[in-house]
Regions:
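N-terminal beta1-alpha1 ligand-phosphate binding loop
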Residues: 14-43
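N-terminal beta-loop-helix "entrance" segment that forms/cooperates
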Residues: 50-70
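Helix-loop-strand module that forms the ligand-binding subsite of alpha/beta enzymes
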Residues: 67-132
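Short, Lys/Arg-enriched N-terminal segments with co-localized hydrophobic residues
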Residues: 2-12
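A generic structural motif
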Residues: 43-49
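Residues at the starts of beta-strands that form the adenosine-phosphate
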Residues: 17, 47, 119
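Short, flexible hinge/linker loops that cap or flank conserved catalytic cores
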Residues: 12-13, 114
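Short beta-strand/turn micro-motifs composed of small residues
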Residues: 22, 52, 124
Length: 132
């Protein structure tokens, strides 16, 4: 038995805005190359835009009542897309600190989470070691 969610009415011309966040801050990151390759493989109905978090200061709840302009612009960019793609390396069995910081900015203050009801996917580049 298959359980399907509610169907979304789509016209043949429907397009979706997909924001992507690159977990590595390195300018020559393989994750950046992967993200660009994925955008080229996507159907024309998907419009991709990178949402950079490079300039975000470290998050603190002290900012919740007065967001810096760069953080407000980041939060607004996340809110403006229909879906998100995280293309990230795995550092120490987790996500990079910069990406964690970006997630904190977009999800705060309480009650204003920019990720709410937003489909997302994660592409992870893992550092693997082999014992010889």
């Amino acid at each position: 038995m298959s359980v399907a969610g509610p169907k979304r009415e789509e016209s043949p011309m429907t397009s979706y805005k997909v924001g992507y966040l690159i977990g590595s801050l390195a300018t020559k990151s393989i994750n950046r190359k992967l993200a660009l390759a994925l955008t080229k493989l996507a159907p024309p109905s998907l419009e991709f835009t990178e949402i950079s978090f490079r300039e975000l200061p470290l998050y603190s709840y002290d900012y919740d009542s007065d967001y810096p302009p760069v953080a407000r612009a980041f939060k607004d960019a996340v809110s403006a897309v229909d879906a998100l793609l995280f293309v990230t390396p795995e550092y120490n069995r987790s996500i990079p600190g910069g990406l964690k910081n970006a997630i904190d900015w977009a999800s705060r203050p309480y009650g204003t989470n920019s990720f709410t009801h937003k489909p997302s996917a994660v592409a992870v580049d893992q550092i693997r070691t082999a014992d010889s």
